[in-house]
Swiss-Prot record:
Record region (Disordered): 406-427, 475-516, 591-627, 669-690, 930-981
Disulfide bonds: none
Protein family: Belongs to the ICE2 family.
Function in brief: Component of the little elongation complex (LEC), a complex required to regulate small nuclear RNA (snRNA) gene transcription by RNA polymerase II and III.
Domain of life: Eukaryota
Any Pfam family the entry gives: NARG2_C
Compositional bias segments (type: Low complexity): 408-424, 599-624
Subcellular location: Nucleus
Cellular-component GO terms for this entry: Cajal body; euchromatin; histone locus body; transcription elongation factor complex
Protein name: Little elongation complex subunit 2
Comp. bias regions, Polar residues: 671-686, 954-969
Alphabetical UniProt keywords: Nucleus, Phosphoprotein, Transcription, Transcription regulation
Length: 981
C-alpha cells in the first residue's frame, strides 16, 4: 500500500537546491571564492601588475566601490600586501646584516628620493638645510657599506659564472640567423688585403673640446618615425621573444641590410657630397665605433671598410672624399652581446606606437649652442694667448685705455705714402695748425669750435678706416716685417723734435712704423714718474684754460658734434673690427683732446707725431727724443669726463671688454675663408653686443676653420623629391665640423615623443627624438647594473648627432626576459654621467684616425683594431697579387663569431644611486645588506604579512651561513638548503 501511494502521489522533497552553489554547497570553487587567501590566478595577476603603486592608492580604489562585502575587502587587502611585499630572492645568500636599522634605511631612502637629483645650490636645499646635511652625513656611512656589498656581488658573480653563459634556445636560434645574414654582407667587399700602414690609436697632440664636434647644417631628412611607448599596463613587462614573432617583426635579412647599408653606395650621400664637398662621409654606427675606444685597455675589436674617391669639381680642382662604411661583424662575441642582439628587436617593437610623423618635422637639434661661461672664458683666453702673444706680440692684459694717442703717422699701412693718404692727411694738418698758432690768451669763439668739431668728425672717420688697413697690413706682413719697422720707429721722432720749424706733414712722418700702436701699450708700463708728473701738469694747465673760455657755447657745439661723430663711427664700423676699438679710441681720443686744448698750445708749431705733441704740450725743448717720450702717457681718466668729445667711446670699450654672454649662436657657424663679408652699412652697430666678438678677425681662433660652409650653402634648401626615401624607417643627413674637417654623417631618429619646447614655453609642444638603449641585467635581484663605458659612449654619440634627444634605458632581466625597469635619462643627467668618460681623449683618437685617412691615396682600405691593442692596422686591397701575408677577409668571416676566452667573469657593478620600486616601498637602501628584523608588531606594520617572532641571537658566518630560512618571504634571502655549484 505504501508502494501504491508512492506511485500514485508525488514524492515529497524537503531538500532545497542551494542558491549559491551548483550541486554541492562546499565545492572547491566556492571555497576559493569565500576564502581570504588569494588564488593562483590573483597571485599571477599581482606578480605582473605595475610596480610602484602604494597601498594607499590600492585601498582608495577599493573604497570607491559601491557595495563590497567584508570577505572581498579582506581578499583585496591580502592581494595588495602580498604583491607589494614580495622581494626578489638573491642568487647567493647575504653574508650578514646591514649596520643600519630598518628605520634608518627608510629614512635614508626618503632623503635619497628627495635630494638625489637636486643640485646643492637649489631652493629645496636652502629651505631644508638640516635634512640635506643629514643626507650628506648618512651618505658617507652608506658608501662604506656599498663598497662591501659590491665586493659581495662580485664574489657572487664568480660563484654563479654559468649565469653569464646562459642563452635560451630561441635566443640562440634568432642570434644565429641575424649573424649569418650579417656575414653574407661581408662578401660584397674585396677578399684580399695587404698591410699598408700601422699607426697608433692615440694622437700626439691634445684636442680642445670647445673646438670639437659642431653641427653645421641638417641637410636632408627622409622617411618617417614612430612615437615611443613608455607606459605599459603591467610591470615587469614580458617581451615577445619566440622564434616565430621576431621574424614577423623584422626578418634577419632586413636587420643585416639596414646595419650594413654602405654610405659609399648611397645615392643621396653622393649628391650631397658633390654639392657640399665634405672631406669625410660616414655612418652613425662607424662614428660610434671610432669614438668607442677607451684607454688604456682598448678592449673593443672592430673592422671598418673605407673607400677613398676623387670627385671632379666643375671649375676647380678635384676633391678627395673618404667614405667610412659601417663596421663589419665582430670576430668574437660574448654571450652578453648575443643576448643584447636578441632582446633589441622585441624591445624596439614593444616600445613603439603605431602612429608616425615625417622625420623632417622632428625638433632634432637645439637652435643655439648653450656654452657655459667657464668654457667661453677659457676659450677666449686661450685664443688671445695663442694669437696675440706669440704672433702679434700684443699684451691684452695691459690697460690700453690709458693711452692718449698713437699719432697720426702710424695709420699708414705701408712705408711709402699713396696719393690718397697724402690728400687725406693734408686737411687734418690744416685744421690743427690754426689753433696751434693761436694766442693762448684768446678764447676761441663758438663758430671756430664748431668748425673744429666738424673737422674732428672727419678725423675720426679717416683714422678709423686707416686703422683697419693698418692691422690688416700688420697681420699680412708677419712678425719679421714688424721687427724691421721697430728698428726705424724712433728716427723720425728725433728729427721732428730737433727741427720744430719744419712743416707739420712730411714724408718722414708717413714712414713711421706701423707697430707703434702695439708697442706703445708696453712702453706705458716702463715710463718714469717724471714723465707722469709732467703729464699731470700739462693736463691741469689744459683744464684751467678750458675753464676760462666761453664754455656755454663751446661745450654745446662740441657735445653735439661728438655725438654725431660717435654715431658715424658706429654706423660705419663693422663687427670685424670690434676688438680693434681699443686702439681706435685711444687714437681718436688724442685728436679730440688736441682740438679742445688747442688754445693752450704754444706758438711753436706742433707735429702730428705723438712724441712731438707730448713735448710741445709739456713745454719741453729737448733736441733728442728718448723712448719714453715718444709715446704719450695718461695716468688718470678724469680728463675724459665732459671735455672729451669721444668719452662715450670709452664706455663702449668697457662694454666690449666684459665677458662674453652665455649664448653664442654664431660660434658654430663662423667662416673666415669662404664666406663673403657683408657691406659695412649692413653690419650691426651695437658695440656692446657680445655676439660680435666671435666674428672678429683679430684673434684668428675665433674664425671658422677652413672647410666650413659658405653662406650661400648655409641657406640652401634641398628638394626631397630629388632623393630616394627609405622604405622603412628614416635617414637624416647632417653636416658636422671637427676643427678644419667637414663630416657628412648619415644617421636616423629611433623614436620620438611630444613634450614642451622649453620650460618657459610649456604650451608649445614639439616632437623630440628619443633613443632607447636595451640593457640586459644579470643581477636584477640585487639592483640595477651601472652603465658601461660603451653604453655611455653610445648615449653620448646620440646626443652629438641629435642634441635635443632624450634617453631611455630598458633594463631587462636576463633570466626571465622581462622589462622590469624603464629608466629615463635627461640631458642634464647624461652630462653628469659623462664625467666618467675622457671625452678629450676620444675626440683625439677620432681626429687622429680621420687625419691619417686624409693622407691616403685613392682606393679601398680596411681599418682593423684588435682587442686590447693600442695600435691600428690599415690594410689596402691587393692589386691582383696575393701573397702568403695577405689578409683574407672572407675566410675570416666565414663562420659565426666565437666566444672570447676570459679568466674573469664579465661582471658589471651595480648603480647604488638608482632606486627600484621595491626599494622605495620597503625602505631599502640600494646596494646594502638587509637590515636586522624588528619585533613582530613592527614587522607586521611594515610588511603587511605575518612575520616570525623568534629573534636571531647567533652570529652569521660570512662564508657558510645565510640568514635564517624564516625570513625568506620578507627579506628576500635564499634558503640555507640551497647549494650553489
Amino acid at each position: 500500500m505504501t508502494s501504491m501511494m508512492a506511485m500514485g502521489e508525488p514524492r515529497l522533497n524537503w531538500d532545497v537546491s542551494p542558491k549559491n552553489g551548483l550541486k554541492t554547497f562546499f565545492s572547491r570553487e566556492n571555497y576559493k571564492d569565500q576564502s581570504m587567501a588569494p588564488s593562483l590566478k590573483e597571485l599571477c595577476i599581482l606578480s605582473s601588475r605595475r610596480i610602484g603603486e602604494n597601498l594607499n592608492a590600492s585601498a582608495g580604489s577599493v573604497e570607491n566601490e559601491p557595495t563590497v562585502n567584508s570577505a572581498a575587502q579582506a581578499k583585496e587587502k591580502v592581494k595588495t600586501t602580498v604583491g607589494m611585499v614580495l622581494l626578489p630572492k638573491p642568487r647567493v645568500p647575504y653574508p650578514r646584516f646591514s649596520r643600519f636599522s630598518q628605520r634608518e634605511q627608510r629614512n635614508y631612502v626618503d632623503l635619497l628620493v628627495k635630494y638625489a637629483k637636486v643640485p646643492p645650490n637649489s631652493k629645496t636645499v636652502g629651505i631644508n638645510k638640516n635634512d640635506y646635511l643629514q643626507y650628506l652625513e648618512m651618505k658617507k656611512h652608506v658608501n662604506e657599506e656599498v663598497t662591501e656589498f659590491l665586493k659581495f656581488l662580485q664574489n657572487s658573480a664568480k660563484k654563479c659564472a654559468q649565469d653569464y653563459n646562459m642563452l635560451s634556445d630561441d635566443a640562440c636560434l634568432v642570434t644565429e640567423q641575424i649573424l649569418k645574414a650579417c656575414i653574407e654582407q661581408v662578401k660584397k667587399y674585396p677578399e684580399f688585403y695587404t698591410l699598408h700602414e700601422v699607426t697608433s690609436l692615440m694622437g700626439f697632440f691634445p684636442f680642445r673640446i670647445e673646438m670639437g664636434f659642431k653641427l653645421e647644417k641638417t641637410l636632408l631628412a627622409l622617411g618617417s618615425v614612430k612615437y615611443v611607448k613608455t607606459v605599459f599596463p603591467s610591470m615587469p613587462a614580458k617581451l615577445q621573444l619566440s622564434k616565430d614573432t621576431i621574424p614577423a617583426i623584422e626578418t634577419p635579412e632586413q636587420i643585416a641590410a639596414a646595419m650594413h647599408y654602405d654610405i659609399s653606395e648611397d645615392p643621396n650621400a653622393e649628391k650631397l657630397v658633390a654639392r657640399y664637398h665634405p672631406q669625410i662621409a660616414l655612418t652613425s654606427q662607424s662614428l660610434f665605433t671610432l669614438l668607442n675606444n677607451h684607454g688604456p685597455s682598448y678592449k673593443e675589436q672592430w673592422e671598418i671598410p673605407v673607400c677613398i674617391q676623387v670627385i671632379p669639381v666643375a671649375g676647380s680642382k678635384p676633391i678627395k672624399v673618404i667614405y667610412i662604411n659601417s663596421p663589419l661583424p665582430q670576430k668574437k662575441m660574448t654571450m652578453r652581446e648575443r643576448n643584447q642582439i636578441f632582446h633589441e628587436v622585441p624591445l624596439k617593437f614593444m616600445m613603439s606606437k603605431n602612429t608616425s610623423v615625417p622625420v623632417s618635422a622632428v625638433f632634432m637639434d637645439k637652435p643655439e649652442e648653450y656654452i657655459s661661461e667657464m668654457d667661453i672664458s677659457y676659450e677666449v683666453n686661450e685664443c688671445r694667448k695663442i694669437e696675440t702673444l706669440e704672433n702679434l706680440d700684443l699684451e691684452f692684459d695691459d690697460d690700453v685705455t690709458e693711452l692718449e694717442t698713437f699719432g697720426a703717422t702710424t695709420t699708414k699701412p705701408s712705408k711709402s705714402p699713396s696719393p690718397a693718404s697724402t690728400s687725406t692727411v693734408a686737411p687734418m694738418t690744416d685744421t690743427l695748425t690754426a689753433p696751434s698758432i693761436a694766442d693762448t690768451s684768446e678764447a676761441p669763439t663758438s663758430p671756430d669750435i664748431s668748425a673744429h668739431s666738424r673737422s674732428l668728425s672727419q678725423i675720426l672717420m679717416e683714422q678709423l678706416q686707416k686703422e683697419k688697413q693698418l692691422v690688416t697690413g700688420m697681420i699680412d706682413s708677419g712678425p719679421e716685417e714688424s721687427k724691421n719697422k721697430d728698428d726705424q720707429r724712433f728716427i723720425p721722432c728725433g728729427e721732428k723734435v730737433s727741427n720744430s720749424d719744419k712743416p707739420l706733414v712730411q714724408d718722414s712722418d708717413l714712414k713711421t712704423s706701423d707697430p707703434l700702436q702695439l708697442e706703445s701699450s708696453m712702453e706705458i708700463e716702463t715710463s718714469s714718474k717724471n714723465d707722469m708728473a709732467t703729464e699731470m701738469e700739462s693736463v691741469d694747465e689744459r683744464v684751467n684754460v678750458l675753464e676760462n673760455t666761453d664754455t656755454n657755447s663751446k661745450e654745446k657745439t662740441v657735445t653735439s658734434e661728438a655725438a654725431n661723430t660717435e654715431d658715424v663711427v658706429l654706423d660705419s664700423s663693422d663687427t670685424d673690427e670690434d676688438c680693434l676699438i681699443i686702439d681706435m679710441e685711444c687714437q681718436s681720443n688724442s685728436h679730440g683732446k688736441t682740438a679742445e686744448v688747442g688754445s693752450n698750445l704754444s706758438s711753436k708749431p706742433a707735429s702730428l707725431n705723438s712724441s712731438s705733441g707730448q713735448t710741445s704740450t709739456g713745454n719741453q725743448t729737448n733736441s733728442t727724443c728718448p723712448e719714453e717720450s715718444c709715446v704719450l702717457k695718461k695716468p688718470i681718466k678724469r680728463v675724459y669726463k665732459k671735455f672729451d668729445p669721444v668719452g662715450e667711446i670709452l664706455k663702449m670699450q668697457d662694454e666690449l671688454l666684459k665677458p662674453i654672454s652665455r649664448k653664442i649662436p654664431e660660434l658654430p657657424l663662423m667662416n673666415s675663408e669662404n664666406s663673403k663679408q657683408p657691406p659695412i652699412s649692413e653690419q650691426p652697430s651695437a658695440p656692446s653686443d657680445a655676439c660680435s666678438w666671435p666674428k672678429s678677425i683679430w684673434p684668428s681662433a675665433f674664425q671658422k676653420p677652413k672647410g666650413r660652409l659658405p653662406y650661400e650653402l648655409q641657406d640652401y634648401v634641398e628638394d626631397t623629391s630629388e632623393y630616394v626615401a627609405p622604405q622603412e624607417g628614416n635617414f637624416v643627413y647632417k653636416l658636422f665640423s671637427l676643427q678644419d674637417l667637414l663630416l657628412l654623417v648619415r644617421c636616423s631618429v629611433q623614436r620620438i615623443e611630444t613634450r614642451p619646447r622649453s620650460k618657459k614655453r610649456k604650451k608649445i609642444r614639439r616632437q623630440f627624438p628619443v633613443y632607447v638603449l636595451p640593457k640586459v641585467e644579470y643581477q636584477a635581484c640585487y639592483g640595477v647594473e651601472a652603465l658601461t663605458e660603451s653604453e655611455l659612449c653610445r648615449l653620448w654619440t646620440e646626443s652629438l648627432l641629435h642634441s635635443n634627444s632624450s634617453f631611455y634605458v630598458g633594463h631587462i632581466d636576463a633570466f626571465t626576459s622581462k622589462l622590469f625597469l624603464l629608466e629615463e635619462i635627461t640631458s642634464e643627467e647624461l652630462k653628469e654621467k659623462l664625467s666618467a668618460l675622457k671625452i678629450s681623449s676620444l675626440f683625439n683618437i677620432l681626429q687622429h684616425i680621420l687625419r691619417k685617412l686624409s693622407s691616403l691615396q685613392e682606393g679601398s682600405y680596411l681599418l682593423s683594431h684588435a682587442a686590447e691593442d693600442s695600435s691600428l692596422l690599415i690594410y689596402k686591397t691587393s692589386d691582383g697579387k696575393v701573397t702568403r701575408t695577405a689578409y683574407n677577409l672572407h675566410k675570416t668571416h666565414c663562420g659565426l663569431p666565437g666566444v672570447p676566452s676570459s679568466l674573469s667573469v664579465p661582471w658589471v657593478p651595480l648603480d647604488p644611486s638608482l632606486l627600484l620600486p621595491n626599494h622605495i616601498h620597503h625602505g631599502r637602501i640600494p646596494c646594502t645588506f638587509p637590515p636586522k628584523s624588528l619585533g613582530p608588531t613592527a614587522q607586521q606594520k611594515i610588511g603587511g604579512t605575518r612575520m616570525p617572532t623568534r629573534s636571531h641571537r647567533n652570529s652569521v658566518s660570512v662564508e657558510t651561513k645565510s640568514l635564517p630560512a624564516q625570513q625568506v618571504e620578507n627579506e628576500g634571502v635564499a634558503s640555507s638548503k640551497r647549494k650553489i655549484t
